Amino acid sequence: MNLLPGMPPVLDRNDVYAADRPNELSPVVKDFPSLVYVPNSKSNSVSIIDPRTFKIIRTFAVGKEPQHVVPSWDLKKLWVAQDLQDQLTLIDPATGKRGETIHIDDPYNVYYTPDGKYSIICAERERRLDFRDAKTMKVVHRLPVPCDGVNHIDFSIDGRYLLATCEFSGELLKVDVANQKVIGTLKLKPAGMPQDVKLSPDGKLFYVANMEANGVHVIDGDNFKSISFIPTGKGAHGLYVSRDSQYLYVSNRGEGSVTLINLKTRAIAAKWKIPGGGSPDMGGVSADGKQLWLSGRYDSVVYVLDTSDGHLLAKIRVGKGPHGLCVYPQPGRYSLGHTGIFR
């Protein structure tokens, strides 16, 4: 495998998530407190939840429209991305306390190249992917994109390319990571509003949630073509891989459910309905793999589901517009960004 120079070795060619097994925390994070960080996009605040008690232990104010809480590549920092304030606010995950705030143009979402060299800012309204030095966060290259609403990314198994979703033009972009250039665009069918994107464990396919088409596209990334489409539910939005790499959890924001896709067969294995409905958006899986945490975007709550059968463990009242919550720490050697893509 011809890896992107400088990226960590692939532990298992058949499972890119091999380092993400239950409770296999990196030495870097093993002593960090287990917390859940919730950006309240309409309250301009971050709520911090103790997952043992399901209680909020702290809330602090940030700038306008905090969208996602993002672990850094080296696992040592969390960034709160506030696109309408043009800033990132640091959280120290060793203490759960907020730190400095820095000016960053339009940070709707934040990712990291697999070699840890660059952060990639999804500057959605500016129609750019901004490559910044991962240590200093200084701009290295601003890459204009030929689409609208670029906001979610995942990387190929070898780190050589990324796929990015363009929510408002219904497209995917393929970007050469080393050369930082767009090398392809793909119009999705059925059309709609693509959201989260996630690589299959074997590295051969990408799954792309489509909120308007109510399901998930299966994409051959190497050949950059659509393979199939899996209907999951109204408003398919967030994508999370189970700790055993067997299932993909798909949050269906428009109907208050979570669909499980078997990652070997691509068949639907189950659908979990949130009692009373809801608006499950983004989130993450607990370190032990036993809980799925999701923000209730239009209900000012956070849902906690038991991954053994999908029953609701807790519904926690938070601020308005909770969005890209981060369960932290999680297993993995390094972070590719978003609310936690670990390999």
Give, region by region, the residue ranges found by the protein language model.
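Predominantly soluble domains enriched in secretory-pathway, periplasmic, or organellar proteins
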Residues: 1-343
